[in-house]
Amino acid sequence: MTDLHRLSIRELAEGLSQAKFSSRELTEHYLKRIAKIDPQVKSYVTVTPEQALREADAADAALKAGNATALTGIPLAHKDIFCTKGIKTTAGSKMLDNFISPYDATVVEKTKAAGLVTLGKVNMDEFAMGSTSESSYVGATSNPWALDHVPGGSSGGSAAAVAADLAPFATGTDTGGSIRQPASFCGLTGLKPTYGRVSRFGIIAYASSLDQAGPMARSAEDCAYLMNVIAGHDAKDSTSVKKELDDYVANLNNTSVKGLRIGIPKQYFNVAGLDADVKARVEESLKKLEEMGAALVEIDLNMTEAYVPTYYLIAPAEASSNLSRYDGVRYGYRCENPADLMDLYKRSRSEGFGPEVQRRILIGTYALSAGYYDAYYVKAQKVRRLIQQDFLKAFENVDVIAAPAAPTTAYKIGASLDPVEMYLGDIYTIAVNLAGLPAINAPVGFDKDNLPVGLQLIGNYWSESQLLSIVHQYQQNTDWHTKRAAIAEENA
C-alpha cells in the first residue's frame, strides 16, 4: 500500500491486527518517506532505522502470537527532550550534542512497553525555550504548509513530522504552549495534560513546575490512543499524581456538546496583535460548536495582563536553577584548553548555550538573586496563585474556556521578531501552565495565506477526557483535521 500514511491510528491498529500489512511494512513506509521528504522539512534530528525495524519485527511476532496491545507495531517520533537509551538526546543544544542517555524516560519506556516503534528523535527549540524551533543547535525546522515558515515551538519537530506524514503521531512537551502553539501552526490536534498526569521522569528539565508531556497527532482520537499509553502515576516523578486513569479512547463520545457551557473571555479577544483571520476562524469554530448545542458564555479573566510578566519570571528562574548542572565538568559540552576551573565554567556555558537560553538564564538568575528574590520571584509566585484562582472562579460558571492557541498564524523563518514580541505571542498559552490546567488545540481552518489556525479549549483539572471528547465531536462535524499540506501528499 502506498498510502499507509493516510490512515488514522485506529485504522493502522485494525490493519495490523487483521494482517492487512505488517509493522515492518508500515515502518519501512515511514522510513522511506522520511528519507525522501524530511530533507525539505528537517523535522528529524536522529532517525533510527535499525532499531525501528528490530522493534517492528518484534511487534510482528507479538501480533502473530496474539499477545499484542492495541497499538503494537505503530511507529511514532519522540521529541528530542525525552531521554532514549542508546540514542542521542540533545534537547536541541550544543551543550548536549554528544549526550547518549543510559536510560529511557518513563514516556519512552511506556511507548516501548505498548509495542510502539520508535522512528527517531525530532527537532525542538534549544532546551524547549522558544516558539519557532529556530533556536535549535542543528538548525531550523520548516512548516510543511509553507517551507519558508516556522512550525512553531518548542515542539516544532514533532508538529512538522506529523503534519508532513513522517510519523503517525509524536510526543511533545509543553512548558508555556510548546504542544498547542506548534499544533496550531501546523494544523494538528495537540493536548497539554493536567500537571502531574504524565510522568516527567527522563524529560530534560526546563521549568519543573510548568513542564508537561503530551500527544500530538492529526485528530483527538489519535491523541486519545497515545494518552492511553503515556498517562499515569510514576513513582520516579515526585510531581506525578496518583489519580484514577480514564480510558481516553472509550470516553471519546462521553461528553455531550449539547448543553456544554463554553466560556469566552472578553480580554482574550481584545488582545492587541490578534490577527483578524485567526479571530474570524476561531469565532466560526465557536459558532459551529454553538450549532452543535453548546452555549457560549462571556466571562472575565481579569488577570490576563499579568500572564506574560509572571511567566517570564518563574520559567527563567526555574531554568536558571535547572541548567546550572551543565558546567563542563560532569557531562555535556566542555570547552577546549581551559586556563583554570573558572575559565572552564565560563567558556563551557557561553559556548554550549545559545543566545535565547543564555537570555533566560540571565533573567532567572537576576530574579533569584539575594536583593531581588522577594521583589520578583516571590511576587510572581503570589500572582501565579491569583491567575489560578481567576480560572477556578470562571469554571464555577462554565465547563471549558475557549481561546485562540496563538494570536497569529506561522510567520517566516528569520522574521526579525525581538524577544519581547516573541514572549507576547505566548499570551494565550502560558497561563494554562502557570495554573497547571489541561488544554487542547484543534485545527479550525486557514488564514488568507493558507496557513492553519487553531482553537484552544482549556479545561478544569483532570478533564482531558472531556477536552478530547469535545474536539472529537467537533471533528466528526468538520474536516479541518483531515486537510494535508502539499508536501504530505507526496509519495516516497
Curated annotation (Swiss-Prot):
Gene Ontology biological process: translation
Positions of the catalytic residues: K79 (charge relay system), S154 (charge relay system), S178 (acyl-ester intermediate)
Entry keyword Transmembrane helix: no
Catalytic activity, reaction form: L-glutamyl-tRNA(Gln) + L-glutamine + ATP + H2O = L-glutaminyl-tRNA(Gln) + L-glutamate + ADP + phosphate + H(+)
GO cellular component, one term: glutamyl-tRNA(Gln) amidotransferase complex
EC numbers for this chain: 6.3.5.7
Listed Pfam families: Amidase
Alphabetically ordered keywords of this record: ATP-binding, Ligase, Nucleotide-binding, Protein biosynthesis
GO molecular function list: ATP binding; glutaminyl-tRNA synthase (glutamine-hydrolyzing) activity
Assembly description: Heterotrimer of A, B and C subunits.
Family: Belongs to the amidase family. GatA subfamily.
PANTHER family for this protein: GLUTAMYL-TRNA(GLN) AMIDOTRANSFERASE SUBUNIT A (PTHR11895:SF151), TRANSAMIDASE (PTHR11895)
Its job: Allows the formation of correctly charged Gln-tRNA(Gln) through the transamidation of misacylated Glu-tRNA(Gln) in organisms which lack glutaminyl-tRNA synthetase. The reaction takes place in the presence of glutamine and ATP through an activated gamma-phospho-Glu-tRNA(Gln).
Protein name, as recorded: Glutamyl-tRNA(Gln) amidotransferase subunit A
Organism listed in the record: Acinetobacter baumannii (strain AB0057)
